[in-house]
């Protein structure tokens, strides 16, 4: 491991990294350095006592990112779904929260005869809060794995006490296991949104009529839609095709009131291959709203790749929930009744 003893050395090692979390950490370090440009005591070639703690935190994250390679976020704030409480974890992955202990552990002990209260206030406060958060969040139907990493492990009886809170104690050099879920299922299972199903039925994606494209007000070219439809055909081939209940009801209403006879016939044929699944809501997808929340929650429950035309949804999933695969397609409307 490269020796990092001051701000300049920390910046130097981070500048040699291209992974997104190292880049994010570098931005935070540079922001801190810039905020101290008028501090007469600050010197980037050393670390003053008042800033040792924040420096050690940045350095720890740098070191741990090379160990915990499945990390997808740093400085993560987890919000309680029922109270105003929050907890901050320096590193998190999919269904995996990691807390770090920055003090000596040899003197951690019980201060009561019943052995229910420990002397380390920081650790005690964490353990008192963690159950509330663990019970509220699920990842692929499972509670998050919570790890507490120590430089040196405390005594055996303290370790057993920590484990009673479903917290896994370990040392800094340990590579903590990831949450186990059915990643392979994403390859074989698709969750289609309304626009995707209607595109599969629409004359615009089948007849490729120049007349339709001249009349369409959408900013799409004929070539785009043809290529898009062929790609969708290849994607759905041999896959398990899911549509959640509320979306399916919307599709049926749209077909009944808008589709022409050919488009209705296509929908009947496609429906033979669609599996209707119940809606659900997982509150951990706080960044998503309304139908987006239902879609993402169902995709997680079913381990299904989302197929959508909604660029806004696609961007949010890519940014906040990378564990849910999402395919973005150009969609077209039902046109047979309108243009014939």
Curated annotation (Swiss-Prot):
InterPro entries cross-referenced by the UniProt entry:
DUF1308
Query: What is the recorded name of this protein?
Result: Uncharacterized protein R220
Q: Which domain of life is it from?
A: Viruses
